[in-house]
Amino acid sequence: QEVTEIKKEASSDFELVFADGSQVEAKTVIYAAGATPRRANIPGEQEYAGKGVSYCAICDGSFYRGKSVAVLGGGDTALDDAVYLADVAEKVYVIHRRKEFRGAAVTVAKLREKENVIFVLEHQVKEIIGEQKVTGVVLEDAAVIDVNGVFVAYGAVPQTDLLKKFAVLDDSGYVRAGETGETALEGLYVAGDARTKKLRQVVTAVSDGANAATAVAEYLK
């Protein structure tokens, strides 16, 4: 069932409220609600998800070795993805609606040194097109860029609303926690993409789960 509320008084156990109104008590909670990638919300994005549209360069970049890809975005997520993809793909188009990037200047400088990175600035993608798989993107001026893959790199939204009242979140909404998953609130642990960390992949989420479970077992002894 879906948990709709987490309650905890100063010295009490946690109280979890479910969507159907039922409740359970627990001495510890491992929170693993993850994070949701921000969407571009343009035609073709949903249609070609998994068929050329991706939200994780490290996860899917190897499928585009020797091919052309587009990276959408202007923040650190987009810049880091472009750096990674530049070592894999034949061409990397970085498409950003502004003239300047929000991400780190040092990463922009690194990208400018790469001959296979093409900046398409002050433009937005209005549609992702294809034939069973992605074949290109259409800009707002109707220009078409032929690519085999599109990486939507607008960052992610952590699913941490249930924890806001416990003051355990960083400025971006992720749960502050170390490698064991332990937070500043006694008994609350976090695992997966909702935790503050650099790399978010299936393998790191699994590792987080194992670490948090081990820490909880020790805590409950």
Show the residue positions of the predicted features.
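FAD-site-proximal beta/loop scaffold in flavoenzymes
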Residues: 41, 46-63, 154-204, 208-211, ...
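N-terminal Rossmann-fold NAD(P) dinucleotide-binding loop
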Residues: 78
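Glycine-rich Rossmann-fold phosphate-binding loop(s) that bind the pyrophosphate
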Residues: 73-75
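Phosphate-coordination loops involved in phosphoryl transfer and adenosine-cofactor binding
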Residues: 65-67, 122, 185
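Nucleotide donor/acceptor-binding cores
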Residues: 27-28, 51, 66-68
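A Rossmann-like FAD-binding core segment of flavoenzymes
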Residues: 1-18, 23-26, 87-179, 218-221
